[in-house]
Structure formats: C-alpha cells, structure tokens
Amino acid sequence: MDDYKDTLNLPKTLFSMRGNLSKKEPNILKSWNENNLYKLIRKKNQEKKIFFLHDGPPYANGNIHIGHAVNKILKDIIIKSKNMSGFDAPYIPSWDCHGLPIEQKVEEKIKSNQGEISTTEFQEKCRKYAQDQVEKQKKDFIRLGVIGDWDNPHLTMNFKNEANIIKTLSKIVQKKHLYQDFKPIHWCLKCASSLSEAEIEYSKKKSDSIIVGFKFKYRSIIEKLFDFQISNKKEIHLLIWTTTPWTLPSSKAISIHPDFQYQLIETERCYLIIAKELVEKTLNTLKIKKSIIRNYVKGRFLEKMICLHPFLKNIDLPVILGKHVTLESGTGAVHTAPDHGLEDYIISQKYNIKTSNIVNFKGEYISNTHDKLDGVNVLEANSIIIELLIKNNTFFHHESLIHSYPHCWRHKSPVIYRATPQWFIDIDQKQLRIKLLQEIKKVRWIPEWGESRIGEMIKKRPDWCISRQRKWGVPMSIFIHKNTRKIHPNTFVFMKKIAKKVELEGLQVWWNIDSKEILGEEYQSYEKILDILDVWFESGNTHTTINYKNKNYTKKNADMFLEGSDQHRGWFMSSLIISTLISEKKPYSEVLTHGFVVDGKGQKMSKSIGNTISPNEIVDTLGADILRLWVASSNYSNDISISNEILKSSSDIYRRIRNTARFMLANISDFDPKKNIISKENMVLLDKWAIGQTKIVQEEIIQHYNNYNFHAVIQRLMYFCSIEMGSFYLDIIKDRQYTLKKHSQERRSSQTAIYYIINSLVRWIAPILSFTADEIWSYLPENNSQYVFMEEWFDKLFYLDQDDLFNYQFWNEIITIKHEINKFLEEAIQNKTINNSLETSIILYVSHELSNKLKILEQETKFIFLTSDIQIKLYDTAPKNAKKSKIVPYLKVSLEKIKGKKCPRCWHYFNFTKKNIKNSDICNRCILNTIGNGEKRIFI
C-alpha cells in the first residue's frame, strides 16, 4: 500500500494546542509595553466618539484581592469592546491615596520616634507609602491584561487633584451648603475619628438587651394624672428597653409617643407604665403573672413629668414627646441620650436639652461620670451599668440579643454614635435631596434595582459629615471666627488662593501656611481649621477632573461608573451629591454594579475561614486569561462564586475556544488573502452559510457586549465553537480541506470562509481572552494593524440571501437532521454494528419537499453526514425497522454497513469491482484529486 500522506493538505501551525498562559502572557505584556499599545490605540481612535468609563479609585493599600480583579477585568472588557465598536474608549486608572489606613501603616513604621516627627514630615511619609502601594497594585493590574494609561494614573494625592478638591469645597461653601454642628455621628473607637455613611457596614452583633425603670419623682402628680390613689408605698416606674446600656449615663430624657395610650399597671413589686399595645409582651418578658391595670392616659399628658436617673444621683430627666417612638418592640418609651443617637439629638433640640459630652475620642467615660465608670471603655461598661441598676432597684430584665449593628468598614469593629463638633453638607438646603432623586431617574442602572436602592438611601440619609480629625488628607482649608464660630465671609476667595498654593506644593501647605498671609490683619480673630476631608469627598470629586485629563471630552458627565454593589452608599452617592451640588447634573450616564466574590459554597471570602483565593496565584498557575474568562462567564449582577472546580470549568471552556482557533489557523497555513480569496459568487454553498452564520453570531455577540452580558457572550461563543463550527461546519469541510487539490477553488473557498471566521472570532474574544487573542492575531496572515485591539469588528462578513433555496431555513433543517443521524450513528457504534460513520451506508426517508432539495445536492449529500454512501427515499417507502426521528417530522433512517474497499487516502469506502487507473488502490475521487483535474464541489 502506498503512503498518500504527501498528497494530502494536512493542517499545519505553530499555534500550540496548550495555552501555557502563565509562561506566554508575560512576553505578550512586554510587547504591549515596549510598543506602547495604549498610545497606539488612542492614536488610531483619536477622531472617534469618546466613551469614558470613569475608574472608581481603589484604596492604595495592600495587595489586590479577587474582588479587585473582578472589577478591573469587567472594566477592561467593556473598554476593549467599546474600542471594537468604533469608540475611542480611554482608560485612566485611579487610586484613593489619602485616609486612615495609610496613616496607621505609617504610624506602625515610626512608632519609636512618632513624637519627634512633624505633621508635614508625617504627611510626606504617607505620600511615599501610598506611592509605593500604587506601584505595587499597578503591576498586578497590568498583569491581568488591563490596558490603560498606567504612566499617567489619576491619584487623589497629585497636587493638582488635591487643589481641585479644595476648589470643589469652596463652591459648596459659596452655595452655603456647608455648616458646622455639634451632633452625634458614627465614631470608630479604633480610627478615633468620625465616619461617613459610606464607611459603615452592618454586621451581626451580640448585644445586651435590658429593661430599665425610671422612677417618677413626684408620685402625687402621677396619681392625679391617672386618677388613681396609691395607698401603698410602691414606686412608679416608666419602663424603657435598650440594647445600648452604656448610653444610660448620657441619658437626658425619656421619649414617649404623644398619641399612644400608656397604662398604669400594679404588680407585686411596683407600678409600671407601659404602652397599651406592648403591655402583654412586656409582662411576659418580665415573667409577671399577677398584675392589675389601674388606668391609662394618652402620652401627651405625661409630657414634662420628671423621672429620676436610674443610677446617677441628683439628676432629673423630663418626659418628652417624639413621634420616632414606635410599637414595634420595647415598652413604648425610650431613654434619650442626645450624644449617642441622631433621633435623640433631634428631639432633644426641640426641648433645648444639651448633650453631656462624657465620652472621649477613645470611647472612654471622662472623669466625674461615676466612680465605677470613669476611664472605662463604653463597649466594656454594660456589666458595670447592670450592677448599678440592680443596686438602685431599677433593673428589670436582661437577655442577649443578636441583631444588625453598624461596624467600621476598615476595622470590622462596632462603632458608636458620639456627639462632636463636625462639618456637614446640608442635604436638604435648596431642595438638594429632591434634585438628587430627580437626577438618578436620568441614569441607566444595571441591574435596574440599583435605582431604587440608591433612591431609598437618598431619602433616608442624614446630612453628610465630611470632616475628619486626622492628618493625611486634603485640608478643609477654612478659617472660623474664634468667638462666633462662623466661617470667614471671604472664604471662597481664600480657598482659591490656598488651592493655587496646594497645586504647587501639595496639601502640606495648609499646615505650614501663616494665617496672616491669607487673612491679613484679621488673622488674630480667626482660627485655622485643621480637620481634613472625608476620603469619600475626595473620591466623589474625581469626576470633576475628567475634562482636565481628556481635553477632547466635552460631556458634562462620564458615560459609566462600574463598581461593587456596596458603592451605592459610597462612591456613587458621594459623586452624585457633589456633581448635583456643583453642576446640578448627574456625574454618570450609566451605573453598573457587580456582586461580591464568594467561595464555591456561597460563603463570603475570609482569611479567618481560609477560603480566599489570590488572583496572583491564579495568574501564576493558570494564566490571566483563565481568570478573565471566569469573570466573563459569571453572572456578575449577583455574588460571584469561585473555586478550583469552577476555574477548571473555565479552563475547559478555554480549551474548546483555543482548539477551534487552532484548527482554523492550521487550515489556512498556506492561504494568502491577497491571492487566494474567493468571491462570494464563486464560493461553495456551505461556505457561504458558514460566513452568513458567523455574521448572525457576530451581531448577537456585539449586542451582548453592548448590554454588558458577558456571560451570554461566552455561552454564544461556546455554542458557535462546539456545535455550529465543531460538530458541523469544520467537521464537514475536513474532507474538502485535506483531499482536494491544494489550489482548487473549492478548497480556497473553505479557506476563505475560515479566514473570515477566525478574523471574526479573534475580535470576539479579544475583550475577554486578551492574551490569547493577541497570540492568534500574530499567526493570522495579512493583519491590518499591529494589534487586534486596534481593530473594529470584522466587516467582510455577509448574510445569505433569504430568497435562495439554500437559505438559513434550509441549513437549519440540515443541521437538525445531521444531529439526529449522529444519534443513530452513535447508537450503532456503541452496539458495535459499525466502527465509524464512513463505513456506513445511510438511507434517509423524507418528505417530497426535502427529498427534492437533497437530490439537488446529488452525491455531495454524503459529505454532510460524513458517510461513504447515502440514498434519499420518500418517507412512505420506509421499512418497518427504519428508525423514526422524535424531533424531525417525516424522517426515518436506516443504517447499513457499506460494502466495498476503504480508500487509504480519503478513508471513504468505494466499489472496487472496476479496475482503477494504473491498478491504484485509491478511489476514483482521490485519483481525480491527485493526478486528475480535481474534484468539483458546488454545495458541500
């Protein structure tokens, strides 16, 4: 038997079957960097319409985690797909560089000589630390394949940006939205600083739940009010319930609802006053079995009654009225500590009740609070307070309660409300809250529930506390009068002067500047405020620098903000407030949020649990493209699961896509687009279908990219590679590719189709599998651009003519029939009736209509079904043992083992009865394709 290998057009490519991504990707990155790929893309797209995705600044502290990777990869996918779609989509990476975590890291390093370092020296060390962290994170983000302007990132600590933040605050001052007040705000004991709403997260906490009695001072007045004469010496207690016993030393009043009915109840121990609807529940909690209801009054009649503090001597507490009191839980009365609750503070203001200020910045009671409490941390005081209540006979009940409680987002520790002098942005001044609610309706929220979520937050949020008592941050840069405590009337002008200095020298200017230089002779009457701004104010201001960074960008807002779903409360909110305040416009057109990363069991990632997965480890072992593919495959609108099993699944998907690309590259190794392209008119019909189907798929994929449905992109890609290409088109054309004459029109036709398809496919995967797309691009003949990222979607595809007999409907029917026949063939192979499809003779029993179509294909029909022989007969003539399709109507199939000889060249079976030319052992078709004029194909 002769060896016919040299007569075949076998596939050939250096594009490897294995990705070896972790080894190849660094070299690809090196190429991108050496050729300044980002700059090349900008130059290529400079005349196009801009799409600007504004990068939410991550914090410049610590290694990147898997959540960072998800965020940056999603942004990169969008930006690359927008570039492909004909936009100029720049990407300017951002970093938050100020704030407490950096201060704490620097403090740890200089602990031994902290007292010897000046404020400005400390700030310089913070700046150096932040810059080091930026460089560290930048390297990791670049390794993920994220293309951006890494040489010119947006850093909040850049002098120009620090100055811009001061300018923004000056405009807020000018609009009279800034005020100072002494009221309770969230306070972190570990930060020793105030916190904004965005810095609060709610977690489960075990608290002490207690019921306390406040004795009425004047018994006779209560008797008269309830119209009941008390003959015994039992005390009368107004009961309150609290989960923060530590706030009792600061209690200044008891709030009740004016419209609730309060009952006077006699028990064996004493008389109790409880809201009517909560009496039964409270008595059950206190395990009081015997009680008598003596009378009741409306809450308003108890106003200004005097109670005694439950354990502090000589302190009278008035009963006050407040509609914040509810019947949801407790007793219908709440103790009121204006230092430690916003509602308490507001209701106390109405009664001119002042704060106590007995808790210092460390969270400790100050001297002279109580000899048992002085110097005690408030979060450790509950047991002491319960002992004091028991001693004073005002304690009624204690139990532990697990409930949602505010925690510091940095330290994950419980916070307290603490009244301190702070600076606030007024959210209701000049109908700002209403404007915010109007602006969010003009934004496209993805998912849609984002609108209602941020809307509810806006409705309920308090005024924004923007001041912090720290050193590493942009200074508020304001002066207040020493006596009146009012802002200097020329503050707007002064702040602009200060901003100019900061732009040249940095934020340290404020600590070094002589007040006289700014205020002149007035300097002795004014005090320099050393508070810095909330980091959320800084990050919320970054959108105002878009025009500065992109001079051709004329929009008033960014096209998109994209962050985790926790940013409705954070960056989305702060940016919205500042933008609406300054320009009366929203800062973004679209807001897309993603969920948090959880493990395979749906548990939150935690170092203590040991279920964290480092993105760097994944990149080093599997490659960045696998990580990117995992991100794209996930439904990011919900929490995103990751595990080794899930990553293995991503690797399997990657393998299918890579192998599809490899097959195509291997089959166009001898194809020169300049010479070998076949026109649409001269193409084999199946190749036309392949190109037409690719165009349909491309439109679907582009739509998925435009809708940010990346998991749908992957699903469509997989179906295209596995089914439409892998098990249909590419499977069918192997015979034509390998066995026909090398330069035949029929073979060049399929190569033209493959060339068009791989050119489309490489663009489809480029936003997601960026490294692999770059590698594929390097193997493609005749690339217009140096890199695939400089291209737009492939534009040489064409649709099939729907008026043609062989339109999409025909081919869809053929594909369905092929899948059905494959099932019958697989069954026969499993039963060992046959070994493969080529040694089978297939008889199809079909309808008249389909019979007529298939007969047009003549002998080419067999190539569709990968068989050596096929016969088409009418459905009614099918024998009883023919297999009936359950899916395709009017289709029955008979399979027979073919008679004849196997051609050693094409592996088809043929009738060897007639003597072949020169006694050859190959079939007549192969003779034509080797020494003859070549086989002709029209359809398949």
From Swiss-Prot:
Major location (coarse): cytoplasm
Motif 'HIGH' region positions after renumbering to this chain: 58-68
Binding, Zn(2+): 903, 906, 923, 926
Protein name in UniProt: Isoleucine--tRNA ligase
Biological role stated in the UniProt entry: Catalyzes the attachment of isoleucine to tRNA(Ile). As IleRS can inadvertently accommodate and process structurally similar amino acids such as valine, to avoid such errors it has two additional distinct tRNA(Ile)-dependent editing activities. One activity is designated as 'pretransfer' editing and involves the hydrolysis of activated Val-AMP. The other activity is designated 'posttransfer' editing and involves deacylation of mischarged Val-tRNA(Ile).
Keywords (A to Z) from UniProt: Aminoacyl-tRNA synthetase, ATP-binding, Cytoplasm, Ligase, Metal-binding, Nucleotide-binding, Protein biosynthesis, Zinc
Cofactor: Zn(2+)
Localization, UniProt: Cytoplasm
Motif ('KMSKS' region): 604-608
GO cellular component: cytosol
Keyword flag Cell membrane: no
Organism taxonomic ancestry: Bacteria, Pseudomonadati, Pseudomonadota, Gammaproteobacteria, Enterobacterales
Recorded catalytic activity of this chain's protein: tRNA(Ile) + L-isoleucine + ATP = L-isoleucyl-tRNA(Ile) + AMP + diphosphate
Residue positions binding L-isoleucyl-5'-AMP: 563
Signal peptide stretch: none
Residues binding ATP, per UniProt: 607
Note describing how the cofactor binds: Binds 1 zinc ion per subunit.
Family annotation (InterPro entries): aa-tRNA-synth_I_CS, aa-tRNA-synth_Ia, Anticodon_Ile_BEm, Ile-tRNA-ligase, Ile-tRNA-ligase_type1, Ile-tRNA_ligase, M/V/L/I-tRNA-synth_anticd-bd, Rossmann-like_a/b/a_fold
Family matches, as Pfam families: Anticodon_1 (PF08264), tRNA-synt_1 (PF00133), zf-FPG_IleRS (PF06827)
Assembly mode: Monomer.
EC assignment: 6.1.1.5
Similarity comment: Belongs to the class-I aminoacyl-tRNA synthetase family. IleS type 1 subfamily.
Gene: ileS
Entry GO MF terms: aminoacyl-tRNA deacylase activity; ATP binding; isoleucine-tRNA ligase activity; tRNA binding; zinc ion binding
Taxonomy, superkingdom: Bacteria
Domain remark in the UniProt entry: IleRS has two distinct active sites: one for aminoacylation and one for editing. The misactivated valine is translocated from the active site to the editing site, which sterically excludes the correctly activated isoleucine. The single editing site contains two valyl binding pockets, one specific for each substrate (Val-AMP or Val-tRNA(Ile)).
TM regions (residue ranges): none
Gene Ontology terms describing biological process: isoleucyl-tRNA aminoacylation
